[in-house]
Amino acid sequence: MDKKQVTDLRSELLDSRFGAKSISTIAESKRFPLHEMRDDVAFQIINDELYLDGNARQNLATFCQTWDDENVHKLMDLSINKNWIDKEEYPQSAAIDLRCVNMVADLWHAPAPKNGQAVGTNTIGSSEACMLGGMAMKWRWRKRMEAAGKPTDKPNLVCGPVQICWHKFARYWDVELREIPMRPGQLFMDPKRMIEACDENTIGVVPTFGVTYTGNYEFPQPLHDALDKFQADTGIDIDMHIDAASGGFLAPFVAPDIVWDFRLPRVKSISASGHKFGLAPLGCGWVIWRDEEALPQELVFNVDYLGGQIGTFAINFSRPAGQVIAQYYEFLRLGREGYTKVQNASYQVAAYLADEIAKLGPYEFICTGRPDEGIPAVCFKLKDGEDPGYTLYDLSERLRLRGWQVPAFTLGGEATDIVVMRIMCRRGFEMDFAELLLEDYKASLKYLSDHPKLQGIAQQNSFKHT
């Protein structure tokens, strides 16, 4: 062994990671690396880069969970090499998946299934769940039109201000999206404008039970009743899919009297995010159908399971089973009682923030985080005609300097001149943490008041409100 080899071996065995040769170079970013390096050095490089991400706990823009207990991490680790799609190889994980489907269907008042198993599936998130619900709507509509001898080349979907996944669905599956635009004084889909957009080519109506822009609910029951009258007048029968990405795991616990789910006969499917207020880690969504008739069988594929076969309906295939396992853990750990306590705590924080922020400026609130109003979000704008000497963009920028990611953005449709700020309250953002936000909020206002030349210069930032 020559001297260089000895030196290299000593470096490999004895050097600390910060004294290692490989850490003295810039990590490759454009070409596949030629040489290997020590695992601790590779980890250190990546770990250090991740410090440049924002602090997830201070991210008040996201709807997604940013806190998970230690047991969730353990279960995710145990399941990291189990492929969710392989039902035959991992039958117990598949059984847990089916249990979760039954539990969610029960939560949303689905009719009792004939064979004891509810109709639904886990997804990578609510966006995939929406895609699946939309596909089933289109297939059901096409069957009806073909049976009536009518053309099927111009399907349309009616909705209010929706998350971007519905725009993707419409484009990918060649469906005209008739989105009822936001306008001042009418920020959500209302029965009158909905009916004006419907015709015999409407595959379905999609209310958003927790609008991404503001947090308010689009209440399905008035829309449902309007569709009943529309059918009585025209003979046209239109289904509903409820996009309950956020509200699906809130209203059942904190506002059970809101009739939004399968208690409404036109509701054929519901989608929701497990990783939002379902409290699961990222990568978990659910879609449930009313019954077997609501899910066209030509969309279902059968795979081997316990010597027999089980139907699957998904866009994604290989992925870890950990998200489903973690969701089941949360269901077992918390139950209805625990979910009610956790969600109520988020609403209490939202109400406190709304009350305190109202004292700090000329604000008009669109959502105050009440359980009968929407999800635990606080959304507000500057009152018309008021000029406090700063914009909400300025305020958002100042808060970000303290680590808080609080989005300011324009509304959509015909309301693009309205700028709002939205604060999401969720598990892990407790009252004491909210008080720290308020202190930084007040400090930001003082700074903007003390430095008037800086006011109004912040540009619309890149926050994604959805």
UniProtKB/Swiss-Prot annotation:
Its cofactor is pyridoxal 5'-phosphate. Pyridoxal 5'-phosphate binds at S126, S127, T212, H275. Induction: By acidic conditions. Expression is regulated by a complex system involving RpoS, cAMP, CRP, EvgAS, H-NS, GadE, GadW and GadX. The level of involvement for each regulator varies depending upon the growth phase and the medium. It is an enzyme of class 4 (lyase). Transmembrane segments: none annotated. The keyword Acetylation applies. It is found in: Cytoplasm; Membrane. InterPro entries: Glutamate_decarboxylase (IPR010107), PyrdxlP-dep_de-COase (IPR002129), PyrdxlP-dep_Trfase (IPR015424), PyrdxlP-dep_Trfase_major (IPR015421), Pyridoxal-P_BS (IPR021115). Converts glutamate to gamma-aminobutyrate (GABA), consuming one intracellular proton in the reaction. The gad system helps to maintain a near-neutral intracellular pH when cells are exposed to extremely acidic conditions. The ability to survive transit through the acidic conditions of the stomach is essential for successful colonization of the mammalian host by commensal and pathogenic bacteria. Changing Lys-276 to Ala increases thermal stability and protease resistance. The unfolding temperature is increased by 11 degrees Celsius. NCBIfam families: Glu-decarb-GAD. Homohexamer composed of three dimers. This is Glutamate decarboxylase beta. It comes from Escherichia coli (strain K12). The lineage of its organism: Bacteria, Pseudomonadati, Pseudomonadota, Gammaproteobacteria, Enterobacterales. The gene is gadB.
